[in-house]
């Protein structure tokens, strides 16, 4: 536990007032904060840590065990579960829980540590995310390209992501290929178009919108409202 806490502090995580005696250590970080990278380094340096994820596990490597799907935990190891908010039935075997609660807020717990700074999301996109009510900032040096128009006021470029049923229906009616936010989890996309039936000022703290727009690392287009 001490090694993990020291690592979190060195990475700039902030401490909340929640007592460390209350259940597993809960750590929250926004998209692009380097959470998974930090966990991989922890495993590499300290073999007594085991990290499982409810998200996408690492590919098999000859160098390290990496982040694995849930399974047996070696006796005596400190067990960490990443993406714990994706399910509330798997967490009991773990001594630390990591997640971005904005991606799946339903099962999130009160954290002991948090980091609301992304190192990947472009500045213009980060400003839009914050403007929708999320505690979110970025240290990225990329300004990024962000264009916001009505659904029919601009082209649909790159990966098209529909964030509500009405926009799915509209895109299907016009024969446009699209994906849902859950289908791009963990991806980093150079060109993204997000389609919303609601205008941008009405989106607010939409989980679907957050999951979609945080996939962008380059050109971002939002087609929202009429």
Curated annotation (Swiss-Prot):
Domain ((+)RNA virus helicase ATP-binding) ranges: 1-115
Gene Ontology BP terms: symbiont-mediated suppression of host innate immune response; transport of virus in host, cell to cell
Keyword Transport: yes
Location of the protein in the cell: Host cytoplasm
Keyword Secreted: no
GO cellular component term, pick one: host cell cytoplasm
Molecular-function GO term, any one: RNA binding
Domain (+)RNA virus helicase C-terminal: 116-226
Keywords: Host cytoplasm, Host-virus interaction, Inhibition of host innate immune response by virus, RNA-binding, Suppressor of RNA silencing, Transport, Viral immunoevasion, Viral movement protein
Superkingdom of origin: Viruses
Pfam family name, one: Viral_helicase1
Protein role: Transports viral genome to neighboring plant cells directly through plasmosdesmata, without any budding. The movement protein allows efficient cell to cell propagation, by bypassing the host cell wall barrier. Increases plasmodesma size exclusion limit. Acts as a suppressor of RNA-mediated gene silencing, also known as post-transcriptional gene silencing (PTGS), a mechanism of plant viral defense that limits the accumulation of viral RNAs.
Stated family: Belongs to the Tymovirales TGBp1 protein family.
Note: TGBp1, TGBp2 and TGBp3 seem to act together for cell-to-cell propagation. TGBp1 is the main movement protein that physically cross the plasmodesma with the viral genome. TGBp2 and TGBp3 would facilitate TGBp1 function.
Subunit relationships: Homodimer and homooligomer. Interacts with capsid protein. Interacts with host AGO1; this interaction targets the host protein for degradation, thereby suppressing the antiviral RNA silencing.
Protein name: Movement and silencing protein TGBp1
Biological classification of the source: Viruses, Riboviria, Orthornavirae, Kitrinoviricota, Alsuviricetes
């Amino acid at each position: 536990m001490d090694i993990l806490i020291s690592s979190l502090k060195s990475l700039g995580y902030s401490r909340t007032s929640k007592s460390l005696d209350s259940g597993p250590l809960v750590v929250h970080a926004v998209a692009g904060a380097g959470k998974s990278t930090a966990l991989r380094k922890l495993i590499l340096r300290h073999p007594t840590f085991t990290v499982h994820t409810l998200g996408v596990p690492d590919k098999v490597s000859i160098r390290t065990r990496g982040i694995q799907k849930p399974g047996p935990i070696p006796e005596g190891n400190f067990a960490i579960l990443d993406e714990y908010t994706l399910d509330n039935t798997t967490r009991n075997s773990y001594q630390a829980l990591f997640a971005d609660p904005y991606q799946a807020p339903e099962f999130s717990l009160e954290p002991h540590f948090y980091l609301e700074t992304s190192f990947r999301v472009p500045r213009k996109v980060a400003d839009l995310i914050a403007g929708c009510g999320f505690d979110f900032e970025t240290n990225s040096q990329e300004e990024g390209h962000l264009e916001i128009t009505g659904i029919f006021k601009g082209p649909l470029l790159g990966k098209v992501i529909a964030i509500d049923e009405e926009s799915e229906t509209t895109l299907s009616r016009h024969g446009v290929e699209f994906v849902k936010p859950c289908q791009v989890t963990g991806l980093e996309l150079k060109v993204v178009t997000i389609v919303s039936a609601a205008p941008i000022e009405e989106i607010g703290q939409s989980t679907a919108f957050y999951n979609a727009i945080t996939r962008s690392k380059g050109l971002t287009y939002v087609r929202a409202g009429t």
